[in-house]
Amino acid sequence: MNANDNKQKILEAVDAGFDAQLATTRDFVAIPSTRGAEGPCQDMIGDLLRERGYEVDDWHIDVEDLKDLRGFGPIEHDFSRARTVVGTYRPQNNAGKSLILQGHCDVVPVGPLDMWENPPFSPVIKDGRMYGRGACDMKSGTIGALYALDAIKAAGLRPTARIHFQSVIEEESTGVGALSTLQRGYRADACFIPEPTNGKMIRSQVGVIWFRLKVRGFPVHVFEAGSGANAIMAAYHLIHSLQKLEAEWNERAQRDHHFGAVEHPINFNPGIIKGGDWASSVPAWCDVDCRIAVLPGWSVADAQSEIIACVSAAARDHRFLSNNPPQVEWSGFLSEGYELKDSAAPEAAFGKAFAAVYGGGGAVPERAFTALTDTRFYGLNYNIPSLCFGASGEAMHGFNEYVDLESLRKTTKATALFIAEWCGVEQV
């Protein structure tokens, strides 16, 4: 059987298994796997891998093992149940190139339930879309990669290289799930992460810094509010100054060879605000959790220094904060940006797969991504070229999140053909 016959059989196998793939995806999306509650998802992945005969490594993550590694971000919540699950396929004939397939099972909070058309963890298929929290980001991609492997087997083939299928947590907040796989010793010739990229390869992505502003005020009864100091209002003063820093960084970004053409690639977001104890008391405290991006090549340490300098300068210009300076705490991501390069071989292999599914000459569309993915750990820490390509969808981190099912079918096909091309296959 020639290579074209193999391709056709794999494509047909994806189609034949697509209903089962959607059923598994729906079950996966139905698990509420917000931060700290990912265990049932990891249980499901472990069971799916064992059913398929993979060698399964399921371990609890020890933060002490990771805290000195490049890209580690502070963990602030209970991490005692944090787990990583890796399924390994070992070939009988080791003739191809090894591969890591990775997906994350953690999802972000859903927000007010009354703003969803359907309950976020009761996935619905309608008009060619699957709706639900995590349906797009990125549970459909994770299950799609698993069914891509299934399609190769269903086609009567088996890969001729080692494959690690990795389900990680913390992608949405620190990335230490992916970091834990590298600390554990998992390596390969390439990595592929099927995040929802709208059918484009991520060429360059920002890094992200999470930090918390801790502002103190002076509480008094509201009838004499002028004699107190309102910590919430003072926090807004700092936010306005950080918006100016955001503007400065976006001006700097115009000189970047990938992000120069992207409108507003650096996004500052005050995402959580807490403060005060009583509506009739001038608030004595306010905490603001913030996120800001940095470009590839920018130093995280230098960016941290600029953030601190910005906050300090704003405090000096404030009546109360000048004598009661706010604190800046690092509360999650301390992540560098990543540019995919030195990756000609896996990109050529994926280009063949892309051409077979999408048509054209194998020129894969690219994007500069104003968020981040776990690819950075593989590329920056261990020089493992890490490709990121996946389906289309909308409303990630918002209401009524969905993945487009036809795009998911195509990306599953492209993933399966890429595995076959990169790892090699032989008849069973």
Predicted regions located by residue number:
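Metal-dependent amide/peptide-bond hydrolase catalytic core
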Residues: M1-K9, F79, R203, R212-V428
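Acidic-glycine-rich active-site phosphate/pyrophosphate-binding loop
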Residues: V110-I125, R203-K214, K352-A353, L387
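Short beta-strand segments
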Residues: Q102-G103, S167, F192-E195, K214-R216, ...
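Acidic/histidine-rich catalytic neighborhood of metal-dependent amide-processing enzymes
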Residues: M130, M138-W210, C423, Q427-V428
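Short, P/G- and charge-enriched loop/turn segments at secondary-structure junctions
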Residues: R70-H77, G199-K200, D256-H258
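A short glycine/serine-rich beta->alpha loop
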Residues: D127-C136, V220-V222, V403
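Acidic/His- and Gly-rich active-site-bordering loop/insert found
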Residues: N2-M130, P159
